[in-house]
């Protein structure tokens, strides 16, 4: 739940300043905060005016921006830092910050126009998050996390409450192409919310009764594998935190996640930032309604983009390996076992 931070092109320094050192710090920050620009946007710049560094550009979250300022301060640059970064997503009128794809399929492009800018297709009924408006296009984030520009008329704008109906709950995934009476073709691979009794929620908000011969049902919440992953993770409770550990003698955060999944025949990469590039995006800060027990959380820090990972247990609880070892804590500030260290991550 990522891209390169560019911070050097707008810096203008007097000759007596350590220009090369600043560029080296920025280059290092670029490498540390890099993840996958297909699902993350960050383009931050700096301008120097006397003893003030103005941070500008665009970003999803403030933590990496604060991290850059922190690195420069630690290097001895005693400037005043002003954060003027434009944070995404933009604010949309009437809280219509979400959308449902209303075309049989539409290509999401890395730029609104141009050759070889194709990212990934989005299918009819797919829920997307609106990121920004640019002329006749909207930049959106698809259900699998990809960013892409699509024409404005390729989706129906909705509020969060309606969007959740398409993102959360039992789904019907079409196993063949289906042509409706109105001529609309639902393509194989399309997912629509299943309301029960062969009733589907269509992309336009209407409902349709359709024989299950055309689709199969999937219900992520009732997958027994989720509880089995949690059971495996709980076998590590109270083990010490060991950097690089993945044995019964101790584990680090990604070692716990990796092994809990491996015990259930799911093999993940070793490190947290690698795991973050696997699977489907199911939540982001400020919206976690779709998260289910067994999902993986990632935490950002000011030193680099992904600094910690944990397994979600439901109701705000996570199991993770941190300083005191493997433990169950809460990410809800109102809970007695709330971990403020996770809030700072």
Which residues make up each language-model segment?
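SH3/SH3-like (including bacterial SH3b) beta-barrel domains
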Residues: 41-45, 112-124, 179-188
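Short glycine/threonine-rich beta-strand-turn micro-motifs
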Residues: 42-72, 137
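Boundary regions of SH3-family modules and the immediately adjacent low-complexity/disordered segments
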Residues: 70-92, 113, 141-239
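Aromatic- and glycine-rich peptidoglycan recognition patches
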Residues: 157, 216, 283-287, 307, ...
């Amino acid at each position: 739940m990522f891209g390169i931070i560019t911070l050097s092109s707008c810096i203008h320094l007097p000759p007596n300043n350590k220009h090369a050192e600043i560029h080296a710090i920025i280059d290092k920050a670029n490498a540390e905060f890099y993840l996958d620009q297909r699902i993350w946007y960050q383009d931050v710049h700096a301008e120097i005016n006397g003893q003030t560094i103005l941070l500008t550009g665009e970003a999803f979250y403030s933590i990496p921006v604060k991290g850059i300022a922190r690195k420069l301060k630690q290097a001895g640059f005693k400037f005043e830092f002003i954060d003027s970064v434009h944070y995404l997503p933009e604010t949309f009128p009437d809280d219509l910050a979400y959308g449902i794809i209303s075309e049989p399929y539409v290509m999401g492009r890395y730029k609104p126009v141009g050759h070889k800018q194709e990212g990934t297709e989005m299918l009819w009924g797919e829920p997307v998050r609106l990121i920004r408006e640019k002329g006749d296009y909207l930049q959106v984030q698809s259900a699998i996390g990809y960013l892409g520009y699509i024409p404005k008329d390729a989706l129906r704008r909705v509020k969060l409450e309606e969007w959740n109906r398409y993102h959360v709950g039992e789904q019907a995934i079409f196993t063949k192409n289906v042509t409706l009476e109105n001529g609309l073709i639902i393509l194989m691979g399309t997912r629509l919310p299943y309301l029960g009794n062969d009733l589907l929620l269509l992309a336009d908000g209407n409902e349709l009764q359709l024989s299950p011969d055309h689709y199969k049902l999937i219900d992520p919440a009732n997958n027994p594998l989720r509880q089995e992953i949690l059971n495996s993770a709980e076998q590590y409770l109270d083990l010490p935190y060991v950097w690089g550990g993945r044995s019964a003698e101790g584990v680090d955060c990604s070692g716990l996640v990796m092994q809990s999944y491996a015990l259930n025949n799911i093999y993940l990469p070793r490190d947290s930032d690698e795991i973050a590039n696997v699977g489907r995006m199911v939540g982001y800060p400020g919206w976690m309604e779709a998260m289910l027990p067994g999902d993986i959380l990632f935490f950002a820090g000011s030193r680099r983009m992904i600094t910690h990972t944990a397994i979600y247990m439901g109701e705000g609880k996570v199991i993770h390996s941190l300083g005191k070892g493997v433990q169950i804590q809460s990410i809800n500030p109102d809970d007695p076992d709330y971990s403020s260290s996770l809030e700072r991550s």
